[in-house]
Amino acid sequence: MRNLLGGKGANLAEMNLIGVPVPPGFTITTEVCNEYFEKGKDAVVALLKDDVEKSIKGVEALMKSKFGDVENPLLVSVRSGARASMPGMMDTILNLGLNDEVVEGLARKTNNPRFAWDSYRRFVQMYGDVVLGMKPVNKEDIDPFEAIIEEVKKAKGVRLDNELDVDDLKTLVVRFKEAVKKQTGQEFPSCAYEQLWGAICAVFDSWMNERAILYRKMEGIPAEWGTAVNVQAMVFGNMGETSATGVCFSRDAATGEDLFNGEYLINAQGEDVVAGIRTPQQITKIGSQRWAELQGISEAERVAKYPSMEEAMPEIYKELDELQTKLENHYHDMQDMEFTVQEGKLWFLQTRNGKRTGAAMVRIAMEMLHQGMIDEKTALMRCEPNKLDELLHPVFDKEELSRARVLTRGLPASPGAACGRIVFFAEDAAEWHNNGHRVVLVRIETSPEDLAGMQAAEGILTARGGMTSHAAVVARGMGKCCVSGAGAINVDYKTRTVEIDGVVLKEGDYISINGTNGYVYAGEIPTQPAKLSGNFAELMELCDKYARLKVRTNADTPRNAQDARGFGAVGIGLCRTEHMFFDDEKIVAMREMILAKDVEGRKKALDKLLPYQKADFKEIFKTMDGLPVNVRLLDPPLHEFVPHDLKGQEEMAQAMGVTVEYIRQRVESLCEHNPMLGHRGCRLGNTYPEITEMQTRAILGAACELKKEGYNPHPEIMVPLIGILYEFEAQEKVIRETAAKLFKEEGVEIPFKVGTMIEVPRAALTADRIASHAEYFSFGTNDLTQMTFGYSRDDIASFLPVYLEKKILKVDPFQVLDQNGVGQLIKMAVAKGRSVRPALKCGICGEHGGEPMSVKFCHKVGLDYVSCSPFRVPIARLAAAQAVIEESL
């Protein structure tokens, strides 16, 4: 049903069936959306015309009113409804069916002229923006409707829209329609059905708007899913003091706490809450008290000015609370609900599974499991692997925080800590981010057009809006830190400054925000790693209960290894030795080895490197005691280590006692036309076996020392970049001969394995021959992808955006494993290798090792483990568990 009716349409139908009060309406299916883009607007309107008019008559009968009628008018809303939730990304039109005559009939019917004209001016503005294309495209453009509203409010001497009287609202309608005629050259449509078809087509068109396309890319939503269109009878929250509108959540979307919460506005329409135009009040008393404490408002003032719905509308609150519980129990998930109260009658406009932060996701899944609402498999499948990343992000350093200057406090809309340079426009946020700057997007309020900037920013700060504003909902969905409703800040877009309690900050100044408690600080505050909850640990234990695939880490330092072990890594799948050479003392010895005139010179330099390497390995083995550590022998081309600047070459010449010219010539001789396919990997080891000998001594020497100290090291030595069996055999011979000598010298023997990286396509094709000698395979999917596609990983950015836009590629193959090409090479190599060595251990150690779809593929083809960066380990563990569960579905 969801695939056909979209999430909103399916949920409305389901709510109706279980007895939740829903305004009548109908849904145009997602299939029609695809036909709309295939056959065109006119063809689809002709096909739908009779069905839509028949459905409108059905709504008229239920509401006992008539669409377009002057005396007893039916007004409708037209909303999008994709299969997956896309909050704010597509378009909505409310109060459709009004014109100059109908508005007078609505005023007479409701005995509320202000409500009628307020609804009309909102409709003209919304229709003008969405259907007639009057919404500003560029950041410097002025919204004609907002400019008119500000002029009228200024002339009247009021601050808020709801302070305008009936005559003011009539003035707005007249001026709005004049603006429509001036900008579009057409009169504003007065025919109700003309308005309806314009709105339906605009919602379909919004499926392909820029922000919707960007959101689909972020969330992995296919374009062919399309959106449904929901046409629903309007109910009004702006009919006076017994009417209201609001958004609520069955649990806290930021923390996951099992606490009903939300916001409402009396005498308002739903868009007012989510757009952040007015800062709303809390639904529950406890929520209101927490809000007041954050704002520094006394209890007496809170009760008098900002009462909760629980206090101001107790009967409505009781019904709302009962129905939200009913909906959560029905869907077995946290619900995000929109509602309207029209003259004392509660209506639900929609419910959906609520967007939530990573922390809330884990807590809700685990607590619902404990409450018996869901089982273990559902709890695991309910968690999105990539969202676990949010739990692992740093928080502000407490000591630095104690010295920081607090500027103001807003609402804690999305948890976490963020600091960066202030920018005021979404385009600038994206541009600054691309230039390597960390930024915080500061806005009066955000809108869906700001999506790209929000994605690029470290965090978002808004002057207006509540916990359910656009900024809050989208930031939580992205896992971005957000502080909203910071009313003390005064944003000036023209001067690109923000004034906070007398302090003026300009674009480019540093600011720090805490989305967990709402505080805003001056300057840049250092961060420290986050502490994980008991729910997280329990989720990880549950992952291990179901997963078959093990998760190792890519780590080159004891700190990285310690982090990964804390996240549950069961070994190191890739320890890159070259990263150990870049300290000041080590790099000099490394350069001496590379630039030496002969073997003796190289050996002399290698003797200097040996103790450094051994000390590094010893610390890593100690950290990973009892777990396997897979060490890759030297891989990059040598030119990456040598100095290319004159100063560096002069220093090397002095250190080695040779001329600068000699150094320059040696450096020049190391440069290659295509270094990634040149003198690197096992080719270095076979050309200079003394390098392999030194590294073997360092690896196994460290293990021997630790064994004597009572530790239990498990070294694995990996030969990189082989394409021919003989390349491996030559390196294995050096390794084993060196090991035999070393063990004799040390008087202790360490079990170790020698394996290889499968990253050259020929190695995958001849894996059966290679497995006759190699004790394990580790697939280096970065280089395997590079060589299979023939794409340079360093240069793909020059054409990848075009390939993605034209759908030549669906995803970046360096981020998501190509299952049809690279994946088939992996599958073939595993089968060939195990045909010779049945117990052959196989894993991957490229960037794909922490990407959920790639992890699931690795499970499918029978790998033993994946290896990824430390902070991706929990993500891979969850994906590995989900892979097992998905097989059984």
Regions found by a protein language model. Give the residues of each.
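C-terminal accessory/binding modules appended to enzymatic or scaffolding proteins
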Residues: M1, S414-A456, V822-A839
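Nucleotide/phosphate-binding sheet-loop regions of phosphoryl- and nucleotidyl-transfer enzymes
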Residues: M1-A404, P412, H437-V440, S447-A452, ...
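Short beta->alpha connector loops at strand-helix junctions that form conserved
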Residues: F26, A463-G465, S484-G487, C575, ...
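Long, charged amphipathic helices and adjacent flexible linkers at domain junctions
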Residues: D50-K54, M218, L380-W432, R438-V439, ...
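Conserved alpha/beta-domain cores
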Residues: R79, L532-N535, L542-L889
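Short, surface-exposed secondary-structure edge patches
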Residues: S250, A430-W432, L451, D501-V504
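A short, small-residue-rich loop immediately preceding and capping a beta-strand
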Residues: E458-R464, C482, G843
